[in-house]
Structures are given as C-alpha cells and as structure tokens.
Regions:
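Short, well-ordered beta-strand segments in beta-rich or mixed alpha/beta enzyme
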Residues: 2-9, 39-66
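Serine/threonine-rich low-complexity intrinsically disordered regions
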Residues: 11-14, 58, 94
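Intrinsically disordered, low-complexity acidic/polar segments
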Residues: 15-17, 61, 97-99
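N-terminal first-folded block
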Residues: 2-40
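An amphipathic, aromatic/His-enriched active-site/gating alpha helix that lines ligand/cofactor pockets
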Residues: 24-36, 55-89
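Glycine-rich beta-strand-turn "strand-cap" elements at beta-sheet edges
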Residues: 2, 41-46, 76-99
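Short, structured helix-loop boundary elements
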Residues: 15, 19, 49, 68-71
Length: 99
C-alpha cells in the first residue's frame, strides 16, 4: 500500500473556492478502484493550509488516478487558485493495526 501525506497552501481569501474544487476532486477520487482513503482537511489554526492524506492499494492504482480527467481538472484548479507550498511525500506502508 502507498500512503501520501502532506499539505498544500492557498491564500485564505480563496479557501471557499478551493473547498468547492476539492469537494469535486475528493468525490471522484473516492470512487476510483484502488483508492483506500482520500481526504483533505483545513488546518484550524493556519487559514489556507490544507492537509492531504491518501492511501492507494498499489502503484498501478495511483498511476491510473494521476491520468484521470478529474485529476487534470484539479491541476487546473490548483493553478487558477494559486495553490503554493505543495509539500507531499509518498510512503510504502503495510495495512497497519488498530490502536
């Protein structure tokens, strides 16, 4: 399994627009085969900072995701909304255990 975690930043005055674009992206991505988890969370103490968490079954699922129409639309939205400070990392993980 692959875990992607990190954050992106948008200017606080564009958060509402970003929320709309993110909602479309999240809904479409969660329907993809191989997507185990896909979530964005706004930082409550740092306006404009959006934390991202993704879990993918395997590299093939992630590659299919990167080629989707909604990923292309998200890239355009990120550019148009001037997202910056993109800081994401990918990790190979096992299935974990309950805490």
């Amino acid at each position: 399994m692959l875990l992607i975690a990190g954050a992106i930043r948008v200017s606080p005055e564009k958060v509402a627009e970003a929320r709309e674009a993110a909602a479309r992206m999240i809904a479409a991505t969660r329907a993809e085969d191989g997507c185990e988890q896909y979530a964005f969370a706004e930082d409550v103490l740092d306006p404009g900072l959006i934390h991202i968490s993704e879990v993918w079954r395997d590299q093939a699922a992630l590659e299919r995701h990167r080629a989707t129409e909604h990923m292309g639309a998200w890239r355009i939205a990120m550019r148009d909304l001037a997202f910056h400070e993109r800081n994401l990392k990918i990790y190979e993980v096992d299935e974990g255990r309950r805490l």
